[in-house]
């Protein structure tokens, strides 16, 4: 009976994986014992007695002593032998020649079919970006999983800490709450910035994974408790109530002596959350930004230092995993209510600000707005609705933290008036904002959101992007004045004058000159 090509391919893939695994083990061994070139046989300097009269415990002691003695006699490697060993180790990890890029008509290249926007995940096909021997010929995506963290994976493999052929065990990782398929998942224009099936990969493509294809989840869904000191304060003030369902009492605190404290232990919030990695469908991303796909590919290639040549040489591959930060969805209340239009939905779309969100900087309103939105989401969930906070990793308006701090320096040395707020950023970055909210609504369509009752945001860009995507917003409201730190008045006034929503007094360009932030001299002690 003839053996089918599929079986032969599977056997070959398994042999390739075994070879790489064996090479990795050998590389680890060489790194531990490599005082000499790995090609040289190591002299046996340890002799272990095996006399029948020697008890087992004694034999173990002899072995340990002999190994310690041998370790002390190991010669210090010279730069030449170390370099040779490292070179040999590199060959063991990567035995083939370096493949800088591939081409559509190259021999053996056969990408796994991928039809973006297909209603059935099997018809759509898995996203495969792996360069492992078992998957490289069937790659249908450019880039690597984990975004910017893919660099740490590469370091871990190079140092021998991680086997490149490690096969994850997904048996207990399925989502504890359901994010079910929506009609938008089958619309190639609604979701173009991540894989809507990313959290279902281990289930949908179990057979393909077992056959050797390196297919990985790009979304993870879990449940957790959220604990913030600001929420404790809100409970003390009576602004949030402990209902035992959404808001729970924290366990009692402990005194220094270990006894139970009678002090207020605070509260915690019952939430569901999802981490979503970027997976770009290039034709859809290009269309969303109003540019050609070829221009998008060229810009991504050139302005990442030429990191991804296949953006140019593989026009047949339409999916790209960019090395950028992910987003996180925080859900307050029943996740099933997100797609139920009869339920009231409160939303905050928040772009990362590490200085304020985590470390409490008062130069901007980011943390107060985030905290206020979380409280609003909790109140909405307790009234029978659902709250959603989407946290995007777009530090410093996607300009980065270094650029942001340089702008801070310019602002403080220049008087820090609101009329110069955006100009200060443009002088350094060349643009006032690079967040480009066109891709942001994708996650709302993934969650099944069809209307937003309460939008806790003043951003005109976020509002316009969401409404343009087909989701109506019934109410928007701004941050209450009493929550705005004095030094962040510069930011908020400049944004209102530039078009941000405000239910209060409108601010003119003439008013901006009068809004001035704190100077450095005022903070010196």
Question: Could you tell me what each predicted segment is?
Answer:
Residues 2-5, 12-14, 30, 42-525:
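Catalytic domains of riboflavin
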Residues 4, 22-25:
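Long, heptad-repeat coiled-coil alpha-helices used as oligomerization/scaffolding rods
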């Amino acid at each position: 009976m003839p053996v089918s090509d599929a079986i032969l391919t599977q056997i070959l893939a398994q042999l390739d994986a075994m070879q790489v695994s064996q090479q990795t083990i050998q590389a680890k061994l060489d790194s531990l014992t490599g005082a000499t070139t790995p090609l040289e046989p190591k002299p046996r300097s340890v002799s272990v007695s095996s006399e029948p009269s020697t008890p087992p415990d004694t034999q173990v002691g002899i072995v340990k002593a002999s190994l310690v003695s041998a370790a002390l006699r190991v010669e210090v490697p010279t730069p030449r032998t170390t370099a040779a060993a490292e070179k040999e180790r590199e060959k063991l990890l990567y035995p083939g020649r370096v493949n800088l890029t591939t081409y559509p008509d190259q021999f053996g290249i056969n990408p796994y079919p991928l039809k973006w926007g297909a209603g059935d995940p099997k018809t759509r096909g898995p996203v495969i970006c792996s360069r492992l021997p078992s998957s490289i010929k069937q790659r249908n995506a450019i880039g690597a999983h984990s975004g910017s963290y893919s660099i740490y994976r590469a370091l871990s493999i190079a140092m021998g800490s991680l086997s490149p052929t490690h096969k994850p065990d997904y048996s207990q990782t399925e989502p504890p709450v359901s994010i079910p398929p929506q009609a938008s998942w089958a619309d190639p224009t609604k979701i173009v910035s991540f894989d809507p099936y990313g959290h279902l990969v281990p289930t949908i493509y179990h057979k393909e994974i077992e056959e050797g294809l390196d297919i990985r989840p790009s979304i993870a869904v879990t449940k957790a408790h959220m604990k913030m000191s600001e929420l404790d304060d809100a409970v003390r003030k009576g602004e949030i109530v402990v209902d035992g369902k959404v808001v729970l009492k924290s366990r009692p605190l402990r005194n220094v002596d270990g006894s139970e404290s009678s002090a207020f232990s605070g509260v915690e919030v019952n939430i569901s959350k999802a981490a979503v990695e970027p997976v770009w469908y290039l034709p859809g991303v290009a269309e969303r930004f109003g540019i050609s796909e070829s221009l998008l590919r060229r810009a991504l290639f050139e302005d990442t230092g030429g990191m991804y040549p296949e953006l140019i040489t593989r026009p047949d591959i339409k999916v790209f995993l960019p090395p950028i930060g992910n987003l996180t969805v925080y859900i307050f209340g029943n996740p099933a209510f997100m797609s139920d239009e009869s339920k009231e939905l409160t939303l905050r779309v928040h772009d990362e600000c590490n200085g304020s969100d985590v470390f409490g900087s008062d130069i901007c309103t980011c943390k107060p707005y985030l905290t206020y939105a979380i409280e609003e989401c909790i109140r909405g969930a307790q009234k029978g609705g659902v709250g959603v906070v989407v946290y995007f990793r777009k530090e410093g308006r996607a300009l980065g933290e270094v650029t942001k701090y340089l702008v801070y320096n310019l602002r403080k040395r220049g008087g820090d008036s609101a009329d110069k707020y955006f100009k200060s950023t443009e002088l350094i970055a060349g643009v006032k904002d690079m967040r480009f909210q066109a891709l942001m609504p994708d996650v709302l369509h993934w969650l099944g959101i069809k209307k937003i009752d309460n939008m806790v945001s003043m951003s005109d860009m976020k509002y316009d992007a969401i409404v343009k995507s087909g989701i109506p917003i019934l109410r928007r409201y701004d941050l209450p004045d009493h929550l705005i730190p004095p030094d962040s008045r510069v930011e908020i006034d400049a944004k209102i004058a530039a078009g941000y929503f405000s239910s209060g007094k409108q601010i003119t360009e003439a008013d901006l000159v009068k809004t001035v932030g704190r100077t450095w001299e005022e903070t010196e002690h």
